[in-house]
């Protein structure tokens, strides 16, 4: 084996020389140089100082502006809450442990950090799935006479919490486990070992199918149908420049949303699956660390894609930050007017990130 398995940990380095020590008790500078841990701590600090303000501002602005408290925006508030879970439950812990070079909070701390980081990440993932599904229902109208209301929005939010818990809770109760991963400064699900009694194999397969493949299929289907619906509406009004402009705007938004999802989850899922199917093979600590923080960075760029790109949210944020005035109001108003369709029931505002 090209790694060292101990009680409740797995270090991706052979202990032939006897240098490997528990990541709960000793600095892991034999894995990578101390400066790499400093870089990791700096990256976590960057995610904290950018992720917290934008997600907190999203919640604050929604409370301040009644027009934002619509059912279609509930899922965006849930997305902001999930990102704050990651900021406080994952980023702050990882920054502190990185400064020490090992997971200083011990086994209980590893369980807590792994749980909150996984819960926040999964809430964000399923929020994107529900967001895509809601837009598909509203725009494509697969169910005739369907009217999206507050009860539907609440059901969507509850669903994201339920699905997140079905991923984050099992490792706490014996189906798989949380252990330090990568550079041993953050904790995640055990993809690395076949530890007796934890059924890691079945849990990893469950996670890959239910919490990656299914969300991927739903998002591609919903946004694919949405783009087709908008294109059909635009084709019926070829003489309308505003309709064509709205179609291009919607298509651009959908492409950005899908690319953001893929950047977030493809690297992590691919590397985790590779490690799971090649247990015992040689791989460095950075191999798992980098994809994990691709997923963590979603707490910063998800709000930029799904909230700041939305004209209504953006306008309210600017007026809140500028003491009730929007210095760009004329530009925002002109852009909003130009993006409306003339006679189509499908508009860019109904399929935009918010």
Swiss-Prot record:
Glycosylation sites: 2, 15
Compartment list: Membrane; Cell projection, Cilium, Photoreceptor outer segment
A single MF term (Gene Ontology): G protein-coupled photoreceptor activity
Entry keyword Disulfide bond: yes
Topological region Cytoplasmic: 62-73, 134-152, 225-252, 309-354
One cellular component (GO) term of this entry: plasma membrane
Organism: Cyprinus carpio
Taxonomic placement: Eukaryota, Metazoa, Chordata, Craniata, Vertebrata
Disulfide bond annotation, renumbered to this chain: 110-187
Residue(s) at site: Plays an important role in the conformation switch to the active conformation: 113
Keyword Lipoprotein: yes
Extracellular side: 1-36, 97-110, 174-202, 275-286
Residues covalently joined to lipid (S-palmitoyl cysteine): 322-323
Name recorded for this polypeptide: Rhodopsin
InterPro entries named among the record's database cross-references: GPCR_opsins (IPR050125), GPCR_Rhodpsn (IPR000276), GPCR_Rhodpsn_7TM (IPR017452), Opsin (IPR001760), Retinal_BS (IPR027430), Rhodopsin (IPR000732), Rhodopsin_N (IPR019477)
Topology of this chain in the membrane: Multi-pass membrane protein
Chain intervals for the UniProt region annotation (Disordered): 333-354
